[in-house]
């Protein structure tokens, strides 16, 4: 893995050759931290107008499909973005709708009672700590602790470890100030991206994926070095080919891509 791949503006000619010549292109992207700045409270996040405008223009072009591959619940991210022609994949791809696809990972449905129990356990174990938020997303759980005091970390870590032990049917994944509990099934954003490509009849070379967190590395790897991958944010080891500084940079890249493909 490269520590920091080249910034996309250093590779415009290469990117134009990769993205401007394929007859049909899949533009797939994470949401929080990639398109929209992360907020302490997930419900406060909004899609910036510039990114929305570019995504809408790209999705209206017959040679482009746009997909959002988010850790959020599918209905939540679809409501936030509210662009009808997009493909939406929620819970890290455990559920997908759009582009002729209507998919829910069948094994993840069996985990719902366990997720209910795990959510109650975390809420009880962390009761009284201000800033701890347990978010039940139907097919997964997120424990957000961005707003919690630093001295709550030992109790938080103990609760996370204990929850993972008590509910072996769930697997814990750590992200940016969040611990996620997902059904322990062979599925991630990489598998979801491959399913999107198969459903659309596209090769990996016709795909672009952007993401900002460790969960996005599976999607980068799924492109097998053939597609175009961009990691958002500073200083992380990544398998992505290119680098975006932040969500503003993502908006600039999407504007450039819109001009390349649409205008």
Predicted regions and their residues:
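Short, basic/aromatic recognition patches
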Residues: 6-18
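Active-site phosphate-binding/coordination module
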Residues: 16, 46-137
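Substrate-recognition "cap/lid" segment bordering the active-site pocket of phosphatases
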Residues: 91, 97-116, 173-204
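Charged, glycine-interspersed solvent-exposed loop segments at helix/strand-loop junctions
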Residues: 132-149, 171-182
């Amino acid at each position: 893995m490269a520590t920091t791949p080249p910034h996309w503006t250093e590779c415009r000619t290469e990117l134009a050759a990769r993205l401007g010549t394929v007859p049909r292109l899949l533009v797939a992207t994470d949401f929080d931290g990639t398109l929209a700045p992360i907020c302490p409270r997930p419900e406060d996040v909004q899609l910036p107008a510039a990114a929305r405008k570019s995504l809408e223009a790209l999705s209206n072009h017959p040679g482009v499909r746009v997909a959002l591959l988010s850790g959020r619940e599918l209905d939540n991210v679809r409501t936030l973005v509210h662009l009808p022609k997009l493909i939406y994949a929620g819970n890290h791809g455990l559920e997908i709708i759009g582009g002729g696809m209507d998919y829910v990972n069948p094994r993840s449905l069996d985990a719902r009672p366990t997720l209910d129990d795990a959510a109650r356990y975390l809420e009880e174990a962390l009761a009284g700590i201000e800033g701890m938020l347990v978010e039940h997303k139907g097919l997964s759980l997120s424990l957000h602790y961005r707003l919690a005091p630093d001295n709550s970390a030992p109790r938080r870590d103990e609760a996370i470890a204990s929850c993972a032990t008590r509910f072996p049917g769930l697997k814990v994944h750590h992200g940016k100030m969040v611990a996620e509990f997902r059904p322990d099934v062979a599925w991630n954003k990489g598998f979801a991206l491959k399913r999107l490509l198969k459903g659309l009849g596209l090769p990996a070379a016709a795909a672009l994926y952007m993401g900002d967190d460790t969960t996005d590395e599976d999607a980068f790897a799924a492109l097998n070095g053939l597609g175009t991958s961009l990691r958002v944010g500073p200083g992380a080891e990544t398998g992505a080919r290119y680098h975006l500084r932040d969500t503003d940079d993502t908006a600039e890249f999407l504007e450039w891509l819109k001009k390349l493909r649409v205008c």
